[in-house]
Amino acid sequence: MSIWIYFEQKKMLQFFYYSKYYYICNMNKLLKEIGATPVTTSIIESLYPELKSPNKKVALLEKQSYIIRLKRGLYVVNPEHSGKTLSTELIANHLYAPSYISMSTALRYYGLIPEAVYVNQSMTVKHSRSFKTPLGNYDYKYISREAFSVGVRSLHMGDYAFLIASPEKALCDLIANSSKVNLRYLTDVEHYIEEDIRIDMEEFYKLDATVFEDYIKVGGKKADSIVTLLKYLKR
């Protein structure tokens, strides 16, 4: 082999490695820009317009663990590559929309109940549904459109935000979706909040009565139980 051929091959090899290094760095940069927000297949494909088969690129990214599939057509970037901590609340909002975090998940988020919650609970105007993902289990319960917007807030966490029930609305939703709970008397309320869910009573008396009143006005599920709860709060 001549010296000229040797150096030409060496240059080509160096070019190949530099090109591959640049491509990987550019790919990581594009994925980092997505951050912790769940994105659809089409959004990921749009990052690689130069490719003839961007859908194959999505499959390869998943296989190489650059992205994590939440369900068909929805992904998050692996935090090892994005450098962003994933938010189960943000994932829940995107996994089945429109929806908001509620019930025990929200009460635990606010520190109102002591027990750990292992399923991410949300409310939706769609049919009730559950999802199992590599990042946890998500459960969605139906709520009427009239009651959906009552007591729901948007919490901003740096560069993203998610919808979550206020403590009052989370309690309404939890009662509404607990089949054995029927608060007819004040003693029922006392037993439920102090013994069943063991809510922080000091924080309970700080709850906003107007949210319960608004829920009752729109005819929310188990409104009669919320009326009794409101009487207990105001006594």
Regions found by a protein language model. Give the residues of each.
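Functional cation/ligand-contacting sites centered on basic and imidazole/sulfhydryl donors
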Residues: 1
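Hydrophobic alpha-helical interaction segments
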Residues: 8, 20, 152-235
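Polybasic, lysine-rich low-complexity intrinsically disordered segments
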Residues: 10-12
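Short beta-edge/loop segments at beta->alpha junctions of small alpha/beta modules
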Residues: 18-98
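Hydrophobic/aromatic-lined pockets within catalytic cores
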Residues: 49, 111, 176-180
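Short gly/ser-rich loop at a beta-strand->alpha-helix junction or flexible surface loop bordering the NTP-binding
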Residues: 69-78, 88-147
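Acidic/polar active-site rim loop that often engages polyanionic ligands
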Residues: 85-88, 149-154
